[in-house]
C-alpha cells in the first residue's frame, strides 16, 4: 500500500527541496553567524594591523582585531606556538587568514550552516588565489606543527590547544607536503586553491591594499550571480516536476 502514497511523498520532498534552496538569498555584504562576528558589516575605523584593510566595511570589531593578533588570543584560546615558536613570516599568514575569517563581508557565496556549539555558520571551499596559498606554504614549511587538520583533535584539557598524545612535532612540510594540502586541509576545506591569480576577479585574496579598494567585492558578486543563475535553472526544472507530481496526486485522489 505504500506505493499509493508515493506521489504525495515525492511532492512533499520536492517542495522541501525547493524551499531549502531559497533559504539563503543574501550572498553579498553579509556576516557569518559565528562566535565573534557582528550581525551586519559596517565601518570600523580602528581595526588593528593586518585587519586594517577591512576598516571601511567589516564583520569584526576593533577589539576582535586586536585580540586575534596575540600569540594565544582569548578569541579561541588557540596557540600558534604549540610546537615551538612559529616563524614571524609564517604567523603573518595565519593572522591574515583569521582577519579574513572574522572581518570579511564578502564570503556569502561560500557560507554553509553547521551545528557547532560556537558557531552556526562557516565558509566552505572559498576559492583562494593560488599565489596566496603558495606564499603561505613557502613561508611556513620550516615552522613546526603536530597535526594536519587544526579544526579538531586537539588536547584542550588545559584550556589551550596542545598536541594530542602520540602526535609528533614536525615541519609543516611533513604534514602539508604541498601548498594545496596546507590551504585545503588545515581548516577542513574552508579554502579551495583556485587556478586564478590575484587581481583576476575570480579568486579571494587573503589580504589586500585597501587604498586600491577591496578586490573581494567583485569576486563575491561574480560567484553570487553564478549561484543565482544555477538556482534559477534548478527551480525552473523543479517547477515542471512539481506540476507533474501535482497532476499525479490529483489523479490518485480521484482514484
Curated annotation (Swiss-Prot):
Pfam families: Folate_rec (PF03024)
Keyword line: Cell membrane, Disulfide bond, Folate-binding, Glycoprotein, GPI-anchor, Lipoprotein, Membrane, Receptor, Secreted, Signal, Transport
Binding site for folate: 97, 101, 118-122, 151-156, 190
Tissue expression remark: Expressed in placenta and hematopoietic cells. Expression is increased in malignant tissues.
Location of this chain's protein in the cell: Cell membrane; Secreted
An annotated Gene Ontology molecular function: folic acid binding
Induction cue: Up-regulated by retinoic acid.
Function: Binds to folate and reduced folic acid derivatives and mediates delivery of 5-methyltetrahydrofolate and folate analogs into the interior of cells. Has high affinity for folate and folic acid analogs at neutral pH. Exposure to slightly acidic pH after receptor endocytosis triggers a conformation change that strongly reduces its affinity for folates and mediates their release.
Protein name: Folate receptor beta
Gene: FOLR2
